Design a protein with these regions (language model features):
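Canonical positions in the second alpha-helix
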Residues: 31-32, 65-66, 102-103, 142, ...
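Residue-level recognition of tetratricopeptide repeat
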Residues: 14, 48, 82, 124, ...
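Single-residue signature of alpha-solenoid repeat helices
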Residues: 25, 59, 96, 135, ...
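Canonical tetratricopeptide repeat
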Residues: 45, 79, 121, 162, ...
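Register position in tetratricopeptide repeats
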Residues: 18-19, 52, 86, 128, ...
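Structural marker of alpha-solenoid helical repeat scaffolds
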Residues: 35, 69, 106-110, 145, ...
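Alpha-helical segment of the N-proximal tetratricopeptide repeat
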Residues: 5-34, 563-566
């Protein structure tokens, strides 16, 4: 076949392809290859025809042969790209990306529009494969090409915005290189915006700041927030983000305080602003205000782990331990989300939770505390965590484990107050008061500002002996110090009340201490009862009733027996039987087996004239406690009033068998 014939055969092959006669085209190409086995066009035409005949392997082989012959010729690369783009081609995306890369190289110095088309296809391919670094680098090449061509600022702005769209899903991967490329795209988009200030620019700034928060770019975040605040002084968004950043960073600098104040001036209902104010109150030891503000702020801005932690801390300071545990759980829940993940805050929240559970001091809380401590990273080597673990074991009754930790800590960390305190708690629980005294004195020497150590030293003196209980310089001094260091420590005020009532005989001062203890802890029945009893003794019924009214108003059914009983007895004494009946019934709902309460209820019914019901109440009292002669007598007297004479006589005889000279029964 001559050169002329080869050209003619190739022309025939081209015409056959144009006419969709692909098998005919293959015949012409094969004829050419017999003569010229390295004919580039013949291999390209075979690739085209085979692709149309759905023979992809043959097509691929032909294109690759052509590329081998002429690696910088376009036709074979274009054909291979078309082949790989067909829907029936699978597992070829990596190969297709290589083909696009080569086409970009070949188009770069020539057809710019085709270069852009291929570049877009390559970016789309990388995006489908979630290869975000390649997406960013390829798109940046496109932008550079546009810049070299002198593209308008508006077009470049749209291209940077498109890059942001392409990379926005990459923030889930937390890949640093992609993150930096995304932030660069934001910065270029912001600088190339036409309308500044304007709504689009404002929204772009918001997205940029949100992105900086996710990547923990502290310096850039602060700068971006300040820049946005300067451009949009009436918008609170940037200031809110900055305030939350300060909250999460755990720092309370002058700048942070200024931001909190400025935000509240701008928007008094701003969640982050109210949270910031709450943290300020916490640092100033205004614990109740802190709890109020942090609770309010968190209703508006729930996903803020640090704020939940600070709320738990404030609640612990005012001894709202159950609520504080719930706040710690909220902090840990918020830290469980990808946005909230932070190992430092997680460890702090777990440790605080354990500390609070230990203060609750029952076995189930101790078990929960141990579980929390086990989750702390590197907790086994932290002496503070070990000291808490020792206390949890002690609360759970695991004395051997608690003692082992105590001994190890005293050897490895003899200067740690918590190590000596743990030893003191163990001795105290075993009633080894002399040893407990030494341990608590050692703890106080190392950390004098801890109210709990003074409280326990005071309790040690209280139970050690009558001498130490009565010695003003011992128990009393320690309880006073504890109360001064922690004005929310109700138990310190309760023991001060015990001292003034039982040792000093100062009823007025004792009443004040019990009242304070009860105000701090409304579950403290001992203090509440004592405050009421001493108020009655002092003739101050108004105070006694105000305490009882406050408790009964808040009480759930079946609770606060002591308050219902005291108020019921007061109404009984003052001739108000109907009110007495209602209160004594409420007391019995809390404790249906209290025989004395049934007896008092019988008396109230009797005074009200409800004799049959009174009889039942007295009988119930004597059933529960057969030794209550008065209840048996009252039942007999009521049977007599109700005309049940035989029953009454039998009951009187029953009383006289037990108590021969019981005058009321003899009279009956």
């Amino acid at each position: 076949m001559s050169n002329k014939e080869v050209k003619a055969a190739l022309k025939s092959a081209r015409d056959a392809i144009r006419n969709k006669e692909y098998k005919e085209a293959l015949k012409h190409c094969k004829a050419v290859l017999k003569q010229e086995k390295n004919n580039y066009n013949a291999w390209v035409f075979i690739g085209l025809a085979a692709a149309e005949l759905e023979q992809p392997d043959q097509a691929k082989g032909a294109y690759k042969k052509a590329i081998e012959l002429e690696p910088n010729q376009l036709l074979a690369w274009q054909g291979l790209a078309n082949l790989y783009e067909k829907p029936n081609q699978t597992d070829v995306k990596a190969d297709l990306a290589d083909v696009y890369q080569k086409l970009l190289e070949l188009y770069e110095s020539g057809d710019k529009q085709k270069w852009y088309d291929v570049c877009n296809k390559l970016v789309e391919l990388y995006h489908q494969e979630k290869k975000y670094v390649e997406v960013a680098e390829t798109w940046q090449k496109l932008i550079r090409m546009k810049q070299e061509e002198g593209a308008e600022k508006t077009e470049l702005h749209q291209l940077w915005k498109k890059m942001i769209q392409l990379l926005k899903d990459s923030t889930r991967n937390q890949d640093n290189k992609t993150g930096q490329l995304l932030l660069t795209a934001f910065e270029h988009a912001l600088h190339s915006a036409d309308t500044v200030p304007g709504e689009d620019h404002q929204n772009l700034y918001k997205d940029f700041i949100q992105c900086l928060s996710k990547f923990h770019e502290v310096a850039r975040l602060e700068k971006a927030c300040h820049d946005m605040m300067a451009l949009y002084p009436t918008m609170s968004y940037a200031l809110e983000v900055l305030c939350l950043h300060f909250v999460q960073s755990g720092t309370l600098s002058e700048e942070a305080l200024h931001c909190f104040s400025r935000l509240l001036e701008m928007d008094a209902n701003s969640g982050p602003g109210i949270i910031g104010f709450g943290i300020k109150c916490l640092k100033e030891n205004k614990y109740r205000e802190a709890v109020k503000s942090l609770t309010e702020g968190l209703q508006k801005t729930k996903q803020c782990p640090a704020a939940w932690y600070y709320l738990a801390e404030a609640q612990m300071k005012i001894h709202e331990h159950r609520n504080a545990v719930l706040s710690c759980n909220q902090a840990l829940e918020a830290l469980g989300t990808p946005e909230g993940a932070n190992s430092q805050w997680k460890n702090l929240a777990l440790q605080l939770k354990a500390e609070i559970l230990i203060k609750i001091a029952d076995a189930s809380a101790a078990e929960e505390a141990i579980k929390a401590l086990e989750q702390i990273a590197d907790g086994s080597s932290d002496p503070m965590v070990l000291a808490l673990r020792g206390q949890a074991y002690l609360n759970k009754g695991l004395m051997d484990q608690a003692s082992k930790i105590s001994q190890e800590l005293l050897l490895s960390h003899p200067h740690l107050a918590e190590a000596h305190a743990l030893e003191g708690f163990i001795h105290y629980s075993q009633e080894n008061y002399e040893q407990a005294e030494k341990s608590f004195l050692n703890a106080i020497e190392r950390k004098a500002g801890t109210a709990e150590y003074h409280q326990y030293l005071g309790l040690t003196y209280w139970f050690m002996s009558d001498e130490t209980k009565k010695d003003k310089g011992k128990a009393l001094t320690q309880f006073l110090k504890a109360a001064k260091l922690d004005s929310y420590l109700g138990s310190a005020f309760c023991y001060l009340g015990n001292y003034y009532r039982d040792i000093a005989g100062d009823i007025s001062r004792a009443r004040g201490c019990y009242k304070k203890a009860f105000e701090l802890d409304e579950t403290d029945e001992e203090s509440g009862t004592a405050a009421v009893s001493l108020s009655v003794e002092l003739g101050d019924m108004d105070t006694a009733l105000s305490i009882l009214n406050e408790v009964t108003e808040k009480a759930r059914p079946g609770t606060a027996k002591w308050a219902w009983l005291h108020r019921g007895l007061y109404y009984l004494r003052t001739g108000q039987p109907s009110q007495a009946v209602a209160d004594l019934q409420a007391a019995l709902r809390a404790d249906p087996k209290d025989s004395n309460c049934w007896e008092s209820l019988g008396e109230a019914y009797f005074n009200r004239g409800s004799y049959s019901t009174a009889l039942k109440s007295f009988r119930k009292a004597s059933e529960l406690n057969p030794g209550l002669v008065y209840s048996i007598y009252r039942a007999a007297a009521l049977e007599q009033i109700l005309g049940k004479y035989e029953n009454a006589i039998a009951t009187y005889h029953e009383i006289l068998k037990k108590t021969e000279n019981y005058v009321p029964a003899l009279k009956g």
